Amino acid sequence: MSMNLIGITSPGVASAIAAAGGRLAGVETQSVEAAGLVALLFRSKDTSWQFLRRSRTALESMVRAQRILEAAAMFGPLLPARPGSLIRDDLEACTLLCGHSRQLAESLRLHGNTTQFQVTITWNPMAALAARRDHPDLAAAAAAGARGAAKEAGHLISRFMADERVAFEAEAMRALATVARDVIALPVDQADMLMNAAVLLAPGAEPDLEHALEALDGSLPGENRIRLIGPLPPVSFAAVSIDRPSRDRVAAARRLLGVREATERHDLRRAYLDIARAHHPDTGAHAAGAQAVGAAAEAFRLLARIAEARLCAEQGDVLLVDILRHDQHRSVST
């Protein structure tokens, strides 16, 4: 049975979790230590989230994962894994830690002490209109309604409310940016929601965030609700993302570069440069050459990373690791 990767932490934090009973949010965890780092894991029968889609099981898994992350963060620095990241066994966990120890340790140092909050702000549109009834645009809408021009009145009100939403969201994002290390705008998926964002905070910055939200609440007339979810480890800003390149994908990259399986990195680079030179504009290559060079560069990066990872994983699948933001996506071959 595969294990879910919670995140990467230090031996000290892992020991503290174990001393407290080894359970996070009621879930039994285990740890694998190697290269001065620890992979925190828990066993789960759930299928990976990418297959669960929008099912109720997926939602329950997401809520449970969030609670586990919240509980883990209470013990100390943690570099979270992208939700749904699976590790097959202890050996693969060791491969992950040993093969990417420098990258993981540096990311843990940079991001492990940061915290993430989700901020949502909703309003009552009718209360917002009532609080702004003296605004010139709404006065014009009232006048239009009084003379029977209901369509014009509705248009004026809709435009006013849309402008207010856009202006407030921009103001809110600016306010959050002044107190946060980073801000990611999240989808606004409810009719009464004005904004939805994830904010990354440095240690001790929570009071600054609270003050900024109080100021925003005061600037927005009507009935408003500000919801703050967290703290969490920085899962939207610095999540461990694991990739296992398929055989077909690797074979396609080798064919594109014209190299064999055991090709060294310097030979991979030479193969890529040969393609780049052949498609250089000075050689009279067509515009499509840029696309060919881009594909060759992607293939080179993939095969070079695999060659490096193979130094630590002589058996089993190769693991490629990136530390990604929520709004970042791994390229086709990296």
Indicate where each model-derived feature is located.
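An interfacial alpha-helical scaffold signature
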Residues: 1-225, 231-245, 250, 320-334
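N-terminal J-domain/J-like co-chaperone modules of DnaJ/Hsp40 proteins
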Residues: 223, 238-287, 295-334
